[in-house]
Amino acid sequence: MVTLHSGKQIIIDNKRIASKEEAAAVSQEEAFKNTLTYQVLKKHNHSDNMEHLQIQFDSMGVYDNTYVGILQTAYASGLKEFPMPCVFTNCHNCLCAVGGTINTDVHKYAESACKKSGGIFVPPHEAVIHQYMREMIVKSGDMSIVSDSH
């Protein structure tokens, strides 16, 4: 049975929702500091201030519709080598043509950029970005930034 609760809810011992009386005794700030989200943000924050975060990611993911813009921006900013695992996949496999894909030139550009800058190139028709990142790159507690078109 599912019970709908409105407003903020506090979980006690990862098991039950606190009563109104129990919840009133809990500091909202302390409760927030005990969340998984807070712990991940704290681990990746490189400032001394949790109000003004300076996040450093563990990995990065890029897919074919965003390759060119991301790579050109990175190179224009002086990037020589990716400072973290950077995966390039080909999510738009439905754009197929006889003998390849409509995006073949973009895929070749990304593959050469990966060889030049130390990225990980996943060939067309092998994986989509979210799947590859989840299965091969990101582990519990990591923070990854991944491009998307929507």
Where are these regions (language model features)?
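Fe-S-dependent hydro-lyases/dehydratases of central metabolism
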Residues: 1-150
